[in-house]
């Protein structure tokens, strides 16, 4: 239940829900009820004013299986995935293990803070074989949350080059 190791205690309601689930003694298939979907769609509506459909939501047991699934679903043999580095190593492994070339856009380390080299990123995104960009936010291992401006710039570059994020 994590994207990266975290150094704060998990919130009590989450711990209580996990303990309650464990005490049931039943660990079969998960069933996603309407209230789960409503919680997700409601959060996106409240937080971002996005109207998302229940059918758009897919569940994954973790980021690593999701990366492999995305690679197989959205990128064909001979195409490429753009990634920043440094990054959590399974990002690159998901491309490698699925026979896809990873294009590395190196982050700039400015006084201990990672920043995106947008000039280099844009050049690499312009390669017609680059079909997807794996966005890691918060950035792991650096822990940086990309700013709204940075995310919008990534989005614009990817949209202009038909690169799925």
List PLM regions with ranges.
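N-terminal "arm"/small-domain region of PLP-dependent enzymes with the aminotransferase-like
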Residues: 1-28, 163
């Amino acid at each position: 239940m994590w994207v990266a190791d975290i150094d704060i205690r998990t919130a009590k309601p989450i711990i209580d829900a996990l303990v309650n689930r464990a005490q049931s003694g039943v660990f079969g298939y998960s069933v996603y009820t309407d209230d789960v979907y409503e919680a997700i769609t409601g959060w996106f509506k409240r937080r971002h004013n996005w109207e998302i459909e229940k059918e758009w939501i897919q569940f994954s047991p973790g980021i690593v299986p999701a990366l492999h699934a995305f690679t197989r679903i959205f990128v064909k043999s001979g195409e490429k995935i753009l990634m920043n580095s440094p990054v959590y190593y399974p990002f690159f492994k998901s491309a490698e293990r699925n026979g896809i070339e990873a294009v590395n856009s190196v982050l700039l380390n400015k006084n201990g803070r990672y920043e995106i080299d947008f000039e280099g990123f844009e050049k690499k995104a312009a390669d017609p074989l680059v079909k997807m960009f794996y966005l890691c936010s918060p950035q792991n291992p650096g822990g940086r949350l990309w700013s709204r401006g940075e995310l919008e710039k990534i989005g614009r570059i990817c949209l202009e080059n038909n690169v799925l994020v």
